[in-house]
Amino acid sequence: MSMLWYPKEYPLVTMAGMGGGATSLQHGGVVIDPTFAKLSSADADTKDTWTPVLSNNDLTAGPSASPGSNWHHGRTTLGFTTGKWYWEVTPTGNAMIGIEPTSENIDREFFNDSSSGLASRDGWIQFEGNEVVSGQSDWSDGDTIGVAFNANNGTIYFYINGSLSYSYDSTMSNSVFKKPAYSVYSGWTLTFNFGAAGFDETPPTGYQAISTGNGASES
């Protein structure tokens, strides 16, 4: 008796709702929830000695119990090389937020003293350790700071409560892997929203939440 062998057919993987409010991945009719970015506790993503203290399901970062006069740096669990990405931050105090290649030294003393990253705080931006934007609108405790980053061309936009406040066209490479980053100081905190439960403000057209469903990854 002869037997016929047929190649196994696999269902196609399709995206569902993968815009700014990315929700699910469909695989053969089965919905798979994507993983959204959080704040990383990995050694490679946090400053040695002065490591940020994470809470709120790893979405809020603060300093250690006895921080002294020291900045505490960290990055997110997920990052990207290219694409258009959006996330939100609610600050208390004058902590710093930004984005940097993961090749950057996370153990540096000052967050804004980087050789390749973007850092912002209260109306200014520094790129590669140099001040490139200053004197713009300050943010206040409890504001929603929207960050839109075009990893294809290096342009970063900062929104305060839904209104564009300032931006900068950097020359950050679109061939290096990068992650959102931050630094907190004594008494200051940052709470991040990566879109898992939706954003407080509407992302700019074409910008997506940082999730595996949208193509973000750990490395």
PLM feature segments, named:
Residues S2-S219:
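PRY/SPRY (B30.2) beta-sandwich protein-interaction domains
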